[in-house]
Amino acid sequence: MTMEEYVNAYYGGELGISKRYGISKADDLTYTSDPSAAFNTTYGATVYNQLNTKSEVFKLLKKEPWTQSGWRVMTGRHATTAGVAENNSEAGGTLPDTDKPDITNVEATLKQIVSTWEISTKAAMLSEADDGLGNLAAFMRKENSEAHMYAIDDMLLATTDTVTAANFESLDRITADHTQRAYIANADADLNIYNITRSTDDWSHPTMQLATPGSAGHAALSLSDLDTLIQGALEEGVNYADLIFLTGYDTYQDLKALMQNDGANAAWNYNLAQGGAGNMNGVTGESGLAFDSRVGSYDGIPIFLSQHVEKDTTSRIHLLDMGNLAMRIAAPTTYVDSTNVAVTQKMSHEFALITAGELICYKFKTQGSIRNLNG
């Protein structure tokens, strides 16, 4: 019921105050001892989620059908183009040597991500009675759907040295440079991806910026870090319109403060037009100038936030070339159930959510990251 209905019922209807508290004109002492045993706490059918279930990373990535497990990349261009030298005694000269571009085959492994749960027939029946959750199956499906997407986002940003082979590949691994492996505390094999050995395949190295170049030391973010990262992607031929930044909430706040302190006045403003006080549930806040320091982009590159971005001391920053990233999907998120107890031979129903595919990177050098930040 609504709050208004509850109040009306409490003061005059089925929950009337006289019924609730036993108010009467006569002195009618009902209890002569502690009545605590007469009370039973009830909890209601609503569960208030205390967890941040916001998941956006999977949604950011374009989706492609899984039509093949491999693809080809060109890692070197034709290299013998040259002018023909004239021969003094002949009209023509010798042609340059023939050559061809270098082409490498890359292959990905299909990953199947599964969230399973089980509800006993007894729990399902009692959820509609007593002090249950109501439709328990619907509740579990909703909450586990959120948990499924949360887990996928967590995989997509897992730090390079903890990526599980059976999970989706990680953007954190894609944006990690093998040549600077010693400064990010990774084993040699941690940075290998698909069938690529990054210690020998230089074409698979992204643009990575360390807070303290050439060192494992941590340092505060600077705008020059961002500029260097962008420059590296531009030099590799990125389409500027395809770039986004992905970072955590703490580094985002550091970036806001940095832009203000460096005099980037376009990043913040006092808005005289928004002088009214805020209002929530009948309570009025303070009136005055509206100060807005939110940063939606840097140099025209949109900024996105995720709680899953790995922290060194503070969250890393990923520069992603979205035109060369995709989720290749073999099976979109699918809900399956087994509710026939004659088949399962137990008094319970089983459920699962399944997503099958893999994170694909078509070009590494236009991806990048800033690491070892501490503010």
Question: Where do the protein language model's features map onto the residues?
Answer:
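Structured segments of extracytoplasmic/periplasmic soluble domains
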Residues: 147-158, 229-232, 236, 258
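Long, repeat-rich segments with strong aromatic
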Residues: 242-250, 254-256
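Assembly/oligomerization interface modules of large self-assembling protein complexes
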Residues: 30-120, 141-142, 164-165
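Sequence/fold signature of self-assembling virion shell proteins
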Residues: 4-12, 17-33, 128, 134-135, ...
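Short, glycine/acidic-rich hinge or "gate" loops at secondary-structure transitions
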Residues: 153-170
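Short, charged/polar, low-complexity loop and linker segments
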Residues: 122-128
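Hydrophobic alpha-helical segments involved in membrane association or supramolecular assembly
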Residues: 58, 71-75, 142, 146, ...
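Internal mixed-charge
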Residues: 100, 104-121, 135-154, 249, ...
